[in-house]
Amino acid sequence: MPQAVMQGKNQKGGEKLELLRNSALAVELTGDQCAVLGELVSIRNLADGDVLVKQGASDNRLFVIVSGALAVARQVEASGEWVTLHTLGKGDLAGELGFMDGRPHYAALRAIGPTQVLCLEREKLESLLKREPVIVYRVMRAIFRVVHVILNRMAMQTSELTNYIFKVHGKY
């Protein structure tokens, strides 16, 4: 392989590894473990409005937002308009539930402006189970930590909304 092509590949591999090291997935990983996981992830660049995952589609990929943002959005059937339910930014994970259980996505993931994400397919992570089980364990811990934060936030929002609706605790 020509030297220039090899350097390009090494540069992209180094960039990908650096992006992975700075992500929530790598919080508990050593440098060597990051390198192993880095071989499994890919980088995807999206333009404004690109749909990363379609509403109702099953998808086995986990995404880490490297730059830009993703809208968690549903398309209104009657009008075709998009309704944004939540916005995910740099450092956030997306698609974690579909990654874990393969169920169809309740909402789509759409790029807000130019967006770059790291992609990890479930099958690729599972391929490490026998030879690198610690990496799989630590990545899954990272995913569950993120899901736990989301669930806590949703519980707090539900509580605040309930208090508001029923005018509980004299806050409203």
Labelled PLM ranges:
Residues 1-172:
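Cytosolic regulatory regions built on CNB/CRP/Popeye-like sensor folds
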